[in-house]
């Protein structure tokens, strides 16, 4: 979509577009179709930029800045997060999630 239309879409919508394009080629069906996006490119910025350019910044805010520089409107919620203090930085493996949360809740 980016190469043809210079329009940036999220990863979920890109799957839908690919399925539709494959269907059109296989069936010859030229029926007018409307594709609705299911998310913003800002939801998966690293994946979106990697798909377009083959690489992407490691930092999510750097990815957001890159999307913005491409003309993709930045959601106000993302812009407001930049520079804010991180309140919770606890990270755990998914198989330890219940145990970790119980320990955290006891504090």
Language-model-detected regions and their locations in the chain:
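PLP-dependent amino-acid enzyme catalytic core
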Residues: 1-107
